[in-house]
Amino acid sequence: MQNKDKYVIWHIQGGLGKNIAGTALCASIKQKYPDRKLIMVVSHPEAFLSNPHIDRVYALGNAPYFYEDYIEGKDVIIFRHEPYNQTDHITKKKHLVNNWCDLLGIKYTQQQPAIYPNYTQQKTIGLWQRPKPIMVIHSGGGPMQGQKFSYSWTRDMPIEIAQEIVKH
């Protein structure tokens, strides 16, 4: 008997910030493909856990029997695009999420990242509340695969500039 499940597989490889940005589009993908299960294969699965729009999350390199379970003989749509390599991103004409929308065939509606805390996280959320807004600076993209040094002038903010921002 053949599996009648339909799948959308979205593969995201990159840093935590890129994965968090990807959370902005999970609801849009499910809206476009309501009859399909959304399967994520990502480098930071913790950003996608508890997301009600996702049916299954796998860490890159930790998806045994994935081909047999989701691809071989199945009705599947696979998205494995690199939005950072798109002209409009490189030339700073469009935001990362907007470029992803183009690649995924989704209308850009200024979607925002969505993190869904689990039960334990919800119970401890008060520990993070402050009387004023919290700003997070992610000054480095991290080393690329095979990169000799951890700093890359094309991806990382110089430490001196990051330190000045923190001071003010």
Regions found by a protein language model. Name each.
Residues M1-H168:
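Catalytic machinery of carbohydrate-active enzymes
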